[in-house]
Structure formats: structure tokens, C-alpha cells
Amino acid sequence: MNTRHFSQLPKPYLAYPKVIQGLIFKKPKGEKVLPQVEYVVDTLNIDSKHLESYNEICGFKNDGFVPAIYLAVLSQSLQMHMMTSEAFPFAILGLVHIRNQIKQTRKIAVNEQITLSCKFGELQPHDKGLQFDFITTAKVGGEVVMESLTTYLSRQKTEKKASEKSKESKEPAYQPKAEWNISENTGRRYALISGDFNLIHIHAVTAKAFGFKQAIAHGMWSKAKALASIELPAAYEADVWFKLPMYLPSTVEFLT
């Protein structure tokens, strides 16, 4: 596996021109293979002002610690550059974020120096195409403090039919915990912080071009909002499947 080292986190917007090129130059047909490469930011110092802005929009406290999901969001910049700089087999526009797993082994202080790495995981068949993973790891002095698995779907023509879902399903006895009034500009505000300017999140006009009636919230924002709404232990795991869109604006009932 090839490893590419960075002295600082690469800017996500520098990859956008190559994303646009993907609309013009189509990916070659044939067998899909993920690049065997790992991108590593050797020394990542947390920008406290940026973290405060992230905490504000997601609802986390400014308590001197870094939410594990924040590091997963930072790794999306590495993911973007991996998809645009390597022999990535799929068109980036149109990828669907379907899952995110996070594991935090202990609390991470804002002033700790972090080594952040990201590599491609497995490529697997999906009933709507092919899915693949990004594996992100954060270390402090060689100690793993955070791991994240991000799964995307690339829609492809497939002969495999979707498995039939059982009609009998018991829902857990959730209790209402909070009601969120999510404003229309949430997607734009979060994009300025996360660097994820996917058009489905920015405005109703651009979202409609992709088949949505309104702009929808970022999945990683909604996950962060949920995590910020509960008391988390020092070590935990959070596994989320993104099933349905959260339209902007909207009122959402949060259950636990």
C-alpha cells in the first residue's frame, strides 16, 4: 500500500475542479478496483475557533475536548482528495452516504497533537450497485483514540434484487427527548464549517435538480446533533445508517 503524507489537512475546495471534471470525462467501464493508498496528516493541531463553530451548529459543549465525529468530518477532506487524486473508479457526484460508524476510546483534549489517517476499505456488492468504505484512524502518540468507518454507495445497474424486508418489525419503546426546529440555512452554515458543499444540502433550487423537493440536512450533521443531545461516556461507539432525508426547514422529534 502506498502512503502519502501531509504536514497539514488539505483544503477540500482544492479538489472541487476535479469533481466538476467528472461530469465531462466519464469513468471507464470494467472491473471496479479501489486504490491501495493511505493518506496521513502527520501532525494535526485542532483549530479551536473552527471547533467552536462546529460545536455551535451541532450542539456540542465547548468543554476542552474534541468530539470524535469532528475528526471524522475533518477526514472527509482526505477522502475528497483520495477520490480526485487517485485512480478512483466511480463518479464522485451521485455517491450516496449510507452509513457512518465511530469508535472513541477515550476523551480527546483540544490541545493534543493528532495523527489522522484515511484509507479505502472494502468494495462490496449492494442491491443498488456497489458500496465501499473509508477507514479513518486518529492517534495520539501512537495510541488509537478514534476510529471511523464511512460507507458510500455508487448506484450501478445490477441484476441482484433487493431482499424482501420482513413486514413484522418491533420498534423499541423510544421516549421523546427533544424537539429540534431546524432552519432552512442549516445546510449552508454546516457546509461552510465542514467543507461539504454537496448541492443537495445548500438550497431548495439546487436540491430539486437532484430529485429532492427541498434541501436536506447533511447526514453527519444530524448524527452529530443526536450525539450532542445525549450524555456520552469517555469511550463509546456510534453506528448510524442514513435512511431518510431530513428536509430543511423542518421540525424533528428526537427520541431516545
Predicted regions and their residues:
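HotDog/MaoC-like acyl-thioester-processing domains
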Residues: 1-34, 95, 101-182, 245-255
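A structural connector/turn signal
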Residues: 97, 103-105, 211, 237, ...
